[in-house]
C-alpha cells in the first residue's frame, strides 16, 4: 500500500507544471498556517486582502439620506473629545466600523491608510470601534497606522446598523449614503479618488 501511494504521488507530481507545484505548496502552507492559532489572523487577513475589490456606488434611488437624529450620533476620539457626525457634514465622510481581531478589517487597513495619506482632513475619516483605547493604540502603533480612530458613545443609528465588520459608509456633503460596503475593499483606488474629488467640487 505504501509503495502504491508513493508511486501514485510520483506520477501526480511529474504531471504538474512548475506553476502548479508552487501553487500547491503555497496552498499547503496556507492550510498549515491556518491550523496554527498564532498565525491564523494574519493569514486570514492576507487572503482577504487578495480578494478585495474597489466598491461601487449605490444607485441614486438607493442612496439613503442621513437623518438629523443620526447626524447627532456622537463618538469620542483618542483624546476623549466628543464629536457628532454633524461636525463633519461639510465634507465627505468615510465611516468605517472595525476591530483589531477582525482579519478582513486588518486586510483593508493599509489601503485606508493610503487613502487617508492622500486626502488627510479634506475627508472626515472616522474609524469606529468598541474596543479599548489601549488595545487599539497598541495595534495602530504596531502596524504603523495613524488614521483617526473613534469610540462608540451611544448606540449606532439605524442607517449605520450592521451585523458584520468591516462595514464602511461613504457619506456625501449632502448627507447621502453613496457607498455601503461590508467586507474588505480596495479603498485607495482611482474610482474612489474620482468619487471623493467630485464630492469636494
Q: Where do the language-model regions lie?
A:
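Hydrophobic membrane-insertion alpha-helices, especially the h-region
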Residues: 21-37
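Thiol-/selenol-based redox modules, centered on thioredoxin-like
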Residues: 170-201
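A short beta-strand-turn-helix
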Residues: 65-67, 72-93
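Conserved hydrophobic packing residues within short motifs/helices of P-loop NTPase cores
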Residues: 95, 126-128
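Conserved redox-active cysteine motifs that mediate thiol-disulfide chemistry
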Residues: 89, 97-114
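N-proximal helix/coil linker or "cap" segments that precede and/or mark the start of modular domains
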Residues: 36-72
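Short, internal strand/loop/helix patches
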Residues: 126, 137-174, 182
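N-terminal Lys/Arg-rich, disordered targeting/topogenic segments
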Residues: 1-18
Amino acid at each position: 500500500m505504501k509503495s502504491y501511494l508513493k508511486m501514485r504521488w510520483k506520477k501526480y507530481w511529474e504531471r504538474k507544471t512548475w506553476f502548479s507545484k508552487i501553487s500547491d505548496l503555497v496552498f499547503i502552507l496556507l492550510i498549515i498556517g491556518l491550523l496554527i492559532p498564532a498565525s491564523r489572523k494574519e493569514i486570514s487577513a492576507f487572503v482577504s486582502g487578495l480578494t478585495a475589490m474597489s466598491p461601487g456606488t449605490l444607485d441614486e434611488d438607493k442612496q439613503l439620506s442621513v437623518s438629523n437624529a443620526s447626524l447627532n450620533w456622537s463618538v469620542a476620539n483618542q483624546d476623549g473629545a466628543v464629536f457628532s457626525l454633524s461636525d463633519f457634514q461639510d465634507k465627505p465622510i468615510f465611516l468605517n466600523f472595525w476591530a483589531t481581531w477582525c482579519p478582513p478589517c486588518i486586510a483593508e487597513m493599509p489601503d485606508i491608510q493610503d487613502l487617508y495619506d492622500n486626502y488627510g482632513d479634506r475627508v472626515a475619516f472616522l474609524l469606529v470601534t468598541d474596543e479599548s483605547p489601549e488595545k487599539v493604540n497598541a495595534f495602530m502603533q504596531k502596524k504603523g497606522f495613524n488614521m483617526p480612530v473613534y469610540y462608540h458613545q451611544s448606540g449606532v443609528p439605524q442607517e449605520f446598523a450592521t451585523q458584520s465588520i468591516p462595514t464602511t459608509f461613504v457619506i456625501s456633503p449632502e448627507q447621502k449614503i453613496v457607498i455601503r460596503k461590508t467586507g474588505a475593499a480596495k479603498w485607495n483606488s482611482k474610482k474612489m479618488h474620482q468619487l471623493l474629488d467630485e464630492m469636494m467640487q
